Amino acid sequence: MASAKEIRNKIGSVQNTQKITKAMEMVAASKMRKTQDAMESSRPYAETMRKVIGHIALGNLEYKHPYLEVREAKRVGYIIVSSDRGLCGGLNINLFKSAMTDIKGWADQGADVEMALVGAKATAFFNSYGGNVVAQVSGLGDSPTVNELIGTVGVMLKKYNEGLLDRLYLVYNQFVNTMIQEPVIDQLLPLPKSKDEEMQRNHSWDYIYEPEPKPLLDTLLVRYVESQVYQGVVENLACEQAARMVAMKSATDNAGDIINDLQLVYNKARQAAITQELSEIVSGASAV
């Protein structure tokens, strides 16, 4: 059995770690509320854009934008959004597993896969994995902006415009609630048709384009892709803070359990030492 002094040192070490994890839990909780506000503020815009684009995809426009044309999928692109920092449980690894499963499905069909990465964890994982990474960005911080993403998104859009990609997907974690974050793979291009059954059933109208659809759609469709990627980044950030808060709370609770166990061991060691001292005193007195 370890000495009482060694056990006291272990208890002190665990207590110091517990203070750190408790502080990280509180910081993550504060940041989570801020990122949730940002996520909820941008969601209506992203969802409205998705509805508008879904309606356009159902329409019969004379001008067929390349983003509306469905091509045979020989080359597939992914924009994968991860966190920059760790200590957030299995958030990133679950996302990577989901992405790898989907990538393998396309690879088995003979499609070439290219990736654009957002976040340091995705960069580290897929560079070591050996994937075909064509663009990457990290260090976005807790308040990302669309301008910081335009470069990475632009690389994939340029490839799609040049016919070097036939599909483009966005991979990110979707915030369900504080305890649940789900990996999601959304198709960005070609534009997915609306899944709204009522819209499909009653699709008897179309937008009026003034003066013509081309200049509007050329701008709108690019903005749509940028808005969806931005929403994915904001959602992933909220997921990161929630997962980190839960992970740090679990670590703090586990540290408390370890301290209680060590305290019990310490008490036993101290009791054994006292008993031994008493035995020695009694033995000495008997000898006298």
From Swiss-Prot:
InterPro entries listed in its UniProt record: ATP_synth_F1_ATPase_gsu, ATP_synth_F1_gsu, ATP_synth_F1_gsu_CS
Keywords of the record: ATP synthesis, Cell inner membrane, Cell membrane, CF(1), Hydrogen ion transport, Ion transport, Membrane, Transport
Main location: membrane
GO MF term (any one): proton-transporting ATP synthase activity, rotational mechanism
Membrane topology: Peripheral membrane protein
UniProt xrefs under SUPFAM superfamilies: ATP synthase (F1-ATPase), gamma subunit
Subcellular location: Cell inner membrane
Gene3D superfamilies for the chain: 3.40.1380.10, ATP synthase, gamma subunit, helix hairpin domain (1.10.287.80)
Entry GO terms, CC: plasma membrane; proton-transporting ATP synthase complex
Biological processes annotated in GO: proton motive force-driven plasma membrane ATP synthesis
UniProt-listed CDD domains: F1-ATPase_gamma (cd12151)
NCBIfam families on file: ATPsyn_F1gamma, PRK05621.1-1
Quaternary state and interactors: F-type ATPases have 2 components, CF(1) - the catalytic core - and CF(0) - the membrane proton channel. CF(1) has five subunits: alpha(3), beta(3), gamma(1), delta(1), epsilon(1). CF(0) has three main subunits: a, b and c.
HAMAP family listed in its UniProt record: ATP_synth_gamma_bact
Family: Belongs to the ATPase gamma chain family.
The protein's role, per its UniProt record: Produces ATP from ADP in the presence of a proton gradient across the membrane. The gamma chain is believed to be important in regulating ATPase activity and the flow of protons through the CF(0) complex.
Protein name: ATP synthase gamma chain 1
Organism (species): Photobacterium profundum (strain SS9)
Designated gene of the protein: atpG1
